[in-house]
């Protein structure tokens, strides 16, 4: 309908002489309007008498002095030139803007429609030119292929957009579900786990805010990406439905835009890599805490017993044990050197308490130490002490049930050596998520078990010796190794 109205308006502002839109329109007394150039040319050919002329359309006479520029019609023509009509009734686009000649040729190098004067210009000299009809089919095929590719990309873009929205909804649902469960579990354990609840909810809400913010940004990018492809498709569809001129006009830019279309995948977050604190974690933690509370009922006050064999440095209260500082030795030639005692066998020391029955628990502070060994021993055997240099005596069969740390991170248990190497202990690497600053030791003499707890990590069990052969009294055992930082026996009140 709009196209028909525009066509009618165009007819009203078309010059009856040149049949083109009026240029510098002049109106006569009869109401008809003509281009200034057309009316001037008509005057020269009509040769009027006594200054009277007649309208080329209705033949009504008019005076030359009565000719008036029609600014209203000129404005209508100007607006009409800016309006793009439908393909059936559209404006003529087949004339060269520079030369006014018909655009009948296509320049292969510049991918532009040109006229015969453009072909002879310096700009296109030496270029390969063809009739527009000759290349139209070729570009029809290219644009059709481009359209097909873009439709496929549109489908992919829409699928990516749908996926990101689905993932966004899934994330919101999952996090809401996790939040609800965490709230319910913490409500039951609020009296002992308030700080855990607060910490976990804060982390979860921070994760929700961060992930949803990034997913929202990714969703916006996907929507913009889809819209961009749609707009390019619309442009191509319009060209393919239009005339040859509309198909080829600016085709180079369209092809470049088409080639630059690259779909960006949205940012995703694998849920299986998340670590969500769950009720099971609370139950395990609570169980460990209860186990620790149970064994702490058997806490005994342990101190160390000085002896003439160990080189360990003992504090006045008999609770701290450390390795001696390096000794300075003056050699015969007057040179000075530093040397360490052999810490592997010289710094071990036992507790003063002799254990022959019952349940006993104590804790050892090993914070800031890079190496240590602790547990229980069946008593020192001076003849065997000198064989401990490579940890060879740290075996249950020799009366040592111990675990140790070395190089700050390697935690090991020492079991009996194998059949092939009976003199060397079998080293059991221990998986400790948090390096202990404080270790709890629980001895059940009748059950023949010795357990070690990581007080730093909610009392989780580090290692347990079972079926221990306690055939004689055993004693708490400490060895600070080469690390001069002290290890401290904690009092029950600590």
Swiss-Prot record:
Cellular component terms (Gene Ontology): nucleus; P-body
Pathway the protein acts in: Protein modification; protein ubiquitination
Residues recorded as bearing N-acetylalanine in the entry: 2
EC number(s) per entry: 2.3.2.27
InterPro entries xref list: B30.2/SPRY (IPR001870), B30.2/SPRY_sf (IPR043136), Butyrophylin_SPRY (IPR003879), ConA-like_dom_sf (IPR013320), SPRY_dom (IPR003877), TRIM/RBCC (IPR050143), Znf-RING_euk (IPR027370), Znf_B-box (IPR000315)
Region described as Required for interaction with GABARAP and for autophagy: spans on this chain: 186-199
Post-translational modification remark: Degraded in a proteasome-independent fashion in the absence of viral infection but in a proteasome-dependent fashion following exposure to restriction sensitive virus. Autoubiquitinated in a RING finger- and UBE2D2-dependent manner. Monoubiquitinated by TRIM21. Deubiquitinated by Yersinia YopJ. Ubiquitination may not lead to proteasomal degradation.
Keyword match 4Fe-4S: no
Main location group: cytoplasm
PROSITE patterns assigned: B302_SPRY (PS50188), ZF_BBOX (PS50119), ZF_RING_1 (PS00518), ZF_RING_2 (PS50089)
Coiled-coil stretches: 132-241
Zn finger intervals (RING-type): 15-59
Gene Ontology molecular-function annotations: pattern recognition receptor activity; ubiquitin-protein transferase activity; zinc ion binding
Location of this chain's protein in the cell: Cytoplasm; Nucleus
Keywords tagged on the record: Acetylation, Antiviral defense, Autophagy, Coiled coil, Cytoplasm, Immunity, Innate immunity, Metal-binding, Nucleus, Phosphoprotein, Transferase, Ubl conjugation, Ubl conjugation pathway, Zinc, Zinc-finger
Family of the protein in this entry: Belongs to the TRIM/RBCC family.
Entry remark concerning the domains of this protein: The B box-type zinc finger domain and the coiled-coil domain contribute to the higher and low order multimerization respectively which is essential for restriction activity. The coiled coil domain is important for higher order multimerization by promoting the initial dimerization.
Name of the protein in its database record: Tripartite motif-containing protein 5
């Amino acid at each position: 309908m709009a196209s028909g109205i525009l066509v009618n308006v165009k007819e009203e502002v078309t010059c009856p002489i040149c049949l083109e839109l009026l240029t510098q329109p002049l109106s006569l007394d009869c109401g008809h309007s003509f281009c200034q150039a057309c009316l001037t040319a008509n005057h020269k050919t009509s040769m009027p008498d006594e200054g009277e002329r007649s309208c080329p359309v209705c033949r009504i006479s008019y005076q030359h002095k009565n000719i008036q520029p029609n600014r209203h019609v000129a404005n209508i023509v100007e607006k009409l030139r800016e309006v793009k009509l439908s393909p059936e009734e559209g404006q003529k686009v087949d004339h060269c803007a520079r030369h006014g000649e018909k655009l009948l040729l296509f320049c292969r190098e510049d991918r532009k429609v040109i006229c015969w004067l453009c072909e002879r210009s310096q700009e296109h000299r030496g270029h390969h030119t063809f009739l527009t009809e000759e290349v139209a089919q070729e570009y029809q095929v290219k644009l059709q292929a481009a359209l097909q590719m873009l439709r496929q990309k549109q489908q992919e873009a829409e699928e990516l957009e749908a996926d990101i929205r689905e993932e966004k909804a899934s994330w919101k649902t999952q996090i809401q579900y996790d939040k609800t469960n965490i709230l319910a579990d913490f409500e039951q354990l609020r009296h002992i786990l308030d700080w855990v609840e607060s910490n976990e909810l804060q982390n979860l809400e921070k994760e929700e805010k961060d992930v949803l913010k990034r997913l929202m940004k990714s969703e916006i990018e996907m929507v913009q990406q889809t819209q961009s492809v749609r707009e390019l498709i619309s442009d191509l569809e319009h060209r393919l439905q239009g005339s040859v001129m509309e198909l080829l006009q600016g085709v180079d830019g369209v092809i470049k835009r088409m080639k630059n279309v690259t779909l960006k995948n949205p940012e995703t977050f694998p849920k299986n890599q998340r670590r969500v604190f769950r009720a099971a974690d609370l139950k395990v933690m609570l169980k460990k805490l209860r186990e620790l509370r149970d064994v702490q009922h058997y806490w005994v006050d342990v101190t160390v017993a000085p002896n003439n064999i160990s080189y360990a440095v003992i504090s006045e209260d008999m609770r701290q044990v450390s390795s001696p500082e390096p000794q300075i030795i003056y050699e015969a030639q007057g040179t000075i050197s530093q040397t360490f005692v052999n810490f592997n066998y010289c710094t071990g020391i036992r507790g003063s308490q002799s254990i022959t029955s019952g349940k006993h628990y104590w804790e050892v502070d090993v914070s800031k130490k890079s190496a240590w060994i602790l547990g229980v021993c069946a008593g020192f055997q001076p003849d065997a002490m000198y064989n401990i240099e490579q940890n060879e005596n740290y075996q249950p069969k020799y009366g040592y049930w111990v675990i140790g740390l070395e190089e700050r991170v390697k935690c090991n248990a020492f079991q009996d050596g194998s059949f092939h190497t009976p003199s060397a202990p079998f080293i059991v690497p221990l998986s400790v998520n948090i390096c202990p600053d404080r270790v709890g030791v629980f001895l059940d003499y009748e059950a023949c078990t010795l357990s070690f707890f990581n007080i730093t990590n909610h009392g989780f069990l580090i290692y347990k010796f079972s079926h221990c052969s306690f055939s004689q009294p055993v004693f708490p055992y400490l060895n600070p190794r080469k690390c001069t930082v002290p290890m401290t026996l904690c009092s029950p009140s600590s």
